[in-house]
Amino acid sequence: MYYQAISQCTQMLKNLESWLHKAEQHAGAKTFDVGVLITGRLAPDMKPFIYQVQSACDYVKAAAAWLSGQTPPKHEDNEQTIDEVRARIRKTVAFAESVTEAQYAGAAERKVSLSWAPGKVLGGEDYLLQMTIPNVYFHIVMAYAILRHNGVEIGKMDFLGPIHWIEA
């Protein structure tokens, strides 16, 4: 579970952070304020780019904390610039990567309660597989789609990030 919760999820956040540089390049080439992308959305009733980043970060830090027996750090949802978005991603990754594999011992059996489901809990493995991973990918995909919709030149390899090939 440690690999899926920490290594894979933090890599996706690092990929997302790398897209910010391309967003800045795109805005510079098209001569508009890159900050406009923070409020970008695909549909009028959809949450904006910044919400997608905040949510992905929140799911990663919650899984890192709850599945290792800790309380997640609180991050204010007040980012307004690309640099602040980048900082949010970096502090989330730093926290998640500070959790050791040893702290994840027993993670599958830990009980996770969610404020919107009073009186119910999820086992750690179900929480990771049914809540964390799908939500991290959902929000990162939405952030990707918003940037692409606004012309930022990112592609599938940017989404996938580094691939750890081994010799055949």
Task: Please name every model-derived segment.
Residues 156-167:
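Short, highly charged C-terminal tails/helix-capping segments
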